[in-house]
Amino acid sequence: NPKQCYVVEPISHQIEILKKNVGQENVKIIQGAITDKKKIEITWDDMTESVPTFSFKEFLDEYKINNIDFLKCDCEGGEYDVFQQSNIEFLKTIPKIVTEFHLRDDENFHKCKFRWFRDNIFPQFDNIQIFSFDGVDIKWDLWNDHFIEYYNEVIVYMDNRK
């Protein structure tokens, strides 16, 4: 059991569902989005909601987090703000990381961003695996730009244990 678990969720009605389902004192549920954007609005079920935002570093500082044993990110595109160069040294101290990287959008923005991450950020981690959503190891496919066009999102597993 973790000593403390933090859940960051941007959508207010999901917060209420989380509170009902989790109900444990060691789980802190925070409404917001981890991003470098100063403000975001999310449309969900025909509603638009302004969401509080904070950078990954601001989140760590605010909650006085200096050690993470396991990080799971499903940020719907915001993962690119977490896995940026300024956070790499801290991320490398986290023993296990599982994150979803989104590659889909209207103008190939995420595919271009993923290529940059693939070429510049991922090589800084010693043990990285990349899977399609059906569980197929596609790490080597993604080094070929042609294959990236076939994926909308991928799961990335980083094992930083020494």
Where are these regions (language model features)?
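Phosphate/nucleotide-binding beta-alpha loop and adjacent structural elements of enzyme active sites
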Residues: N1-K162
